[in-house]
Amino acid sequence: MDIIKFDVYRGPNIGVYISVNDNTILLPMGFAKTKAEKLAKYLGVNYLFTSIANTRLIGALCIMNNKGILLPKTAYQNEFDFLKKELDLEVGVLDSKLTALGNVICANDKGAVVSPWLSKEDCQTISDVLGVETIQKKIAGFNQTGVVMVANNSGAAIHPEADEEDMKTFSNLLGVKIEQSSINNGIPYVSSGILANNNCIIVGSLTTGPEIMMLTRAFLN
């Protein structure tokens, strides 16, 4: 598994706009085809152009693993229908006032760390659609668990100030080793600059050598 630097819309915040699992990368409408082909090749997936809630913010608004994808209630019916048709996944909608689902849920194929802002009913929906166990807990004082942690099925990166005991809890839930890291030259909101599936890790173009070493420990060792 490689770690590769990339940028999107001339910036390093690749995780805001893109979502990926082991089969598909979801990219915004109008995204350059040459870049789409490159990303798909690196990640070993097919690419699909879509919008969510008529925006480009796919990574921020949805959460996807290899079993399902969860959309916010602001997603349009035609977007839901398109993803249902094109993806061999359970497709669900979370009926919550919180719509940036990628910011409040961190999931792999085994577990999901969910923001305390979401309800027990929301957790049940997450569990049903993604096929995972859930836990609700802040990370380093943040309710936005999906912003400060990224996981695949072999590792996870978490906010540099995350509590060690919490990391053990999350490690048991997700079934992976977890390492503290930042991204893009000191940004602690790791999901903004990482795309992780089980084939490759793509990071924002400003990510430093020491950060790549931390991510190597998280995902490759």
From Swiss-Prot:
- Give the species this sequence originates from: Nitrosopumilus maritimus (strain SCM1)
User: Has UniProt tagged this entry with the keyword Protein biosynthesis?
Assistant: yes
Fetch the Pfam families from UniProt: eIF-6
Extent of the signal sequence: none
Keyword list, A-Z? Initiation factor, Protein biosynthesis
Which BP terms does GO give this entry?
Answer: assembly of large subunit precursor of preribosome; cytosolic ribosome assembly; maturation of 5.8S rRNA; maturation of LSU-rRNA
Record's family? Belongs to the eIF-6 family.
Which molecular-function annotations from GO does this UniProt entry contain? ribosome binding; translation initiation factor activity
Q: Which GO terms describe its cellular component?
A: cytosol
Q: Which function does this protein serve?
A: Binds to the 50S ribosomal subunit and prevents its association with the 30S ribosomal subunit to form the 70S initiation complex.
Record bears the keyword Protein biosynthesis: yes
What is the recorded name of this protein?
A: Translation initiation factor 6
* Gene from which the chain derives: eif6
